[in-house]
Amino acid sequence: MPAVVREFIDKGTFEGSLEIQRQLIADYKEDIRKYAEGMDQTRILNVFNHIPAQLAKDNKKFQISKVSSGARFRDYRGCIEWLDDAGMVNVCYCLNFPELPLQGNYDDTKYKIYFADSGLLVAMLDEEAQEDLRTNKNLGVYKGALYENVVGEALVKAGYKLYYYKRDDSSLEQDFFVRTANALIPVEVKAKNGTAKSMRTLINSEK
């Protein structure tokens, strides 16, 4: 059993669990400093540190321009791949079209970045958000981010690669797509009560 889970079961509070998670984050950052080379160390750390804020946006697409002024994707592509290869994050790519096949049908310059361990997202929240979680069990703007991160983590552990779809000329967006046999299955994550409008639109368009 993971130490974080054992700590919560034994004490029934988040306090000890959060301390363990924060130590894991510190260990991850130390690994980046130890194993990443040259300028990539700073860039990788910047990407890692910006994940919570980027997931808190309505549009959860990761924007390199928000990581550093004047930052360009081509300078950060290897940094994102490094984090993915290290097992620290899961990258979800935007499909060009919501249809099969998935390989070759996505834009590698449009993506979301989730933590491979959803608990680390909680541990990296700002102090105000941490206090709201402890006191009121309220995640505020991070609620949708956490729900998506949990689902993305589960899909990866089930053996799926992560893809989403966002139509450029409308608000239509589907959180995840998975392939089973010859079918493309949309997955919509809802952090609150409401209708799955995007999913219904996609399904109706195939009729």
Describe each region flagged by the PLM.
Residues 129-132, 195-196, 207:
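General structural signal for secondary-structure boundaries
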